[in-house]
């Protein structure tokens, strides 16, 4: 196409992202249950949905921060390209957008897995495997569509729906923690 390519980065990034999200979310609820601080947190006058959403947002923001080195990669390729600046910025922007949406879904699934167990290791393994299966079966097509530069509203709605569904189910499960 005559442009410097950054495709390799965006082909491997989802596989790394599913592990990063599983690692960031494994402690969200599993550690609280394991240490017994979940009941103390629930005794505070804070709505359950606020606790879950804030935990999700904290992990999601950290995941997005973890994506910032990709921007550094863009500028390196930008300045190293012949002639300088000969890189498809639209494809890069679409790919970054795809990674942000993918991280929203992976973070939600990882948080959901953390609500299911009291062990951080089990939460990590369950989150990584769930993210892998979800990516392989469903998310890969939506992600590859966005990385080609085609930002379809259906893809965006799908990623947001996965994240919201995971948050809602996490709220329902978190409400049952300690009542067993």
Regions found by a protein language model. Give the residues of each.
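Transmembrane helix-loop junction
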Residues: 31, 43, 75-79, 115, ...
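Residue-level signal for the membrane-embedded core of alpha-helical transmembrane segments
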Residues: 13-21, 64, 68, 100, ...
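Hydrophobic/aromatic residues in alpha-helical transmembrane segments
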Residues: 21-25, 37, 73, 108-109, ...
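Helix-loop-helix units of permease transmembrane domains in multi-pass membrane transporters
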Residues: 28-58
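Secretory targeting signals
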Residues: 1-7, 54, 58-121
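Long, hydrophobic alpha-helical segments
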Residues: 8-31
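Terminal transmembrane helical anchor/hairpin motif
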Residues: 1-4, 116, 123-180
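Residue-level signature of transmembrane alpha-helical cores of multipass secondary-active transporters
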Residues: 8, 23-24, 95-99, 155, ...
